Amino acid sequence: MGLSTLEQKLTEMITAPVEALGFELVGIEFIRGRTSTLRIYIDSEDGINVDDCADVSHQVSAVLDVEDPITVAYNLEVSSPGLDRPLFTAEHYARFVGEEVTLVLRMAVQNRRKWQGVIKAVDGEMITVTVEGKDEVFALSNIQKANLVPHF
């Protein structure tokens, strides 16, 4: 998923503090709106609980208060990726080859921006997804949002 310049800067700023607490920074989303939201996804081999989210929120808030990279009012949310885990990097897609995913593209491919299929392969910055029996290839930079589809 192509990150905005702000999201790239924020990722660089908060990766070290998150990792220092023993967590993986899965990714971030900055959603602009009347009340903007900075959403941070963390994970660990042991899973994530509410106290973990609070610890990361406290640490990240301190970094953001000093650096002050966001010029508008916003809410900070820290959570686990959940069952419908968002995918941000080529490594995330590679980790979940064989899993079903929904994609929202920045620019339409074949007149479609929304796609759902099974991740087949990752080649550099290109993601192959099998959609209705046909392989479709998407540039990571054209993927606005991607989430795993949970099955119960």
From Swiss-Prot:
Source organism per UniProt: Escherichia coli O1:K1 / APEC
Protein localization: Cytoplasm
GO biological process: ribosomal small subunit assembly; translation
Family as reported in the entry's similarity comment: Belongs to the RimP family.
Disulfide bond entries: none
Protein name per UniProt: Ribosome maturation factor RimP
Primary localization class, coarse: cytoplasm
PANTHER family: RIBOSOME MATURATION FACTOR RIMP
InterPro entries: Ribosome_maturation_RimP (IPR003728), RimP_C (IPR028998), RimP_C_sf (IPR036847), RimP_N (IPR028989), RimP_N_sf (IPR035956)
One Gene Ontology CC term in the entry: cytosol
Its biological purpose: Required for maturation of 30S ribosomal subunits.
Pfam annotation, one family: RimP_N
Top-level taxon of origin: Bacteria
Entry keyword set: Cytoplasm, Ribosome biogenesis
